[in-house]
Amino acid sequence: MNFWLQEQAQSNGNRLAIVTNQLSLTYEELYHRAKTIAQYLTSLNQKRIGLYISNDIDSVVLIHACWLAHIEIAMINTRLTRHEMINQMNSVDIATIVHTLPLELEGFNLYHFNDLTQLDKHDVSGYKFNLESIASIMFTSGTTGPQKAVPQTFNNHLASAKGCKQSLGFEQNTVWLSVLPIYHISGLSVILRAVIEGFTVRLVKKFQTDDMLTQIKTYPITHMSLVPQTLKWLMDAGLTQPFSLEKILLGGAKLSPQLIEQAFAYRLPVYNSFGMTETCSQFLTASPQMLKERFDTVGKTSENVEVKIKNPNAYGHGELLIKGENVMNGYLYPKYLKDTFDNDGYFQTGDIAEIDDEGYVIIYDRRKDLIISGGENIYPYQIETIAKDFEGIEDAVCVGISDDTWGQVPILYYVTNQDINQNELIEHFENHLARYKIPKKYYQVESLPYTSTGKLQRKKVKSEDLNEGKNNES
């Protein structure tokens, strides 16, 4: 079979493939540019290269060019330190990195995208497209140990796109506004869905509230991928009606009931999802109707995905295990990692979850974020949700700290522009939580650390001194 981009160029060539504020390419134009760059890339004589790229057209051309040249791409998070980049690339035997952004990194052969045309050209028309080949390599966050290299095959990506089409829905007339970084699976998956289906991606380099609102109001945007915090920023800034939006896909963090209530009040078509780097983006998806029935669900089990709970406790809570064609076959690095899959071939996600009587899947917390106090499990999300329900609190995060008596106890950081009576806040918790779950310390802070795409940096909350301003011990 031919590569998806070649098929779109032949059957859908005049349709816009990629649009930015500066430039646009049809599928035919994208294919010819990518094929030309692929002919130069073969001179590198590399099976696998690193990519240091951003959300722009050159980067999309480069991605497709690598695939046309049968080169695996290892994505580099541009926010990493040089030391982290070097360790990641060395772990998967990368010798050459191609970049569209300025980059200096010792120990590698570096080529800027614009300099590739100085290389010799070789024909790539004889290459055969193989679905079982590795398309991309991405790294997990490594917050629970060494960073893990995740190989994603073309078949993994295809299965993910098919699952998304079934649960979310898209077609060739779809226009998908994408601001999530394409070096992350959430961003790259939009590029892949587009080339598989033949729809248009409107690519945004960086999340800026005013620019995003302008694009939504000006262009016929039908789909959009966000994390919950960026949706909140958009609603606060004036996204109070759907305009042409048909689907807003949320992921990367848990939804609060307050956010869902606000979105539904504005008639925004929000879908919640669960996915990982290891599952090539979303694995489960909750429709607006599902969210109205159960706000905290990430969807239901279906015939295309297999889900089970490992060692459930008395409440039905246990580790979420999943199986499907979009799940990776195993890590490239470390190659032999214990407890990746169970004996039945289910991937062990590390998430604490429940499947209720209606088949709804509810994710409580990452196992690594779980607070264990005196042998009792405490889910930070539950505490954060109740905190945000207290009048005047705009944002909150709960983390565990060491305690000589209980092992760990929860503490709360919250954001407000009002004078909060902390005795009343504690009473609010007492009315909603068992005593062992009530935070033992409270810190009022100006803001919480989020990435540029709106994802809470929980690790920074644990490692940095946010204890500025008012605080109180209960």
UniProtKB/Swiss-Prot annotation:
One of its GO terms (molecular function) is medium-chain fatty acid-CoA ligase activity. It catalyses: 2-succinylbenzoate + ATP + CoA = 2-succinylbenzoyl-CoA + AMP + diphosphate. InterPro entries: AMP-bd_C (IPR025110), AMP-bd_C_sf (IPR045851), AMP-dep_synth/lig_dom (IPR000873), ANL_N_sf (IPR042099), MenE (IPR010192). It comes from the Bacteria. Its EC number is 6.2.1.26. It holds the Pfam family AMP-binding_C. The keyword ATP-binding applies. Keywords: ATP-binding, Ligase, Menaquinone biosynthesis, Nucleotide-binding. Belongs to the ATP-dependent AMP-binding enzyme family. MenE subfamily. Converts 2-succinylbenzoate (OSB) to 2-succinylbenzoyl-CoA (OSB-CoA). This is 2-succinylbenzoate--CoA ligase. The lineage of its organism: Bacteria, Bacillati, Bacillota, Bacilli, Bacillales.
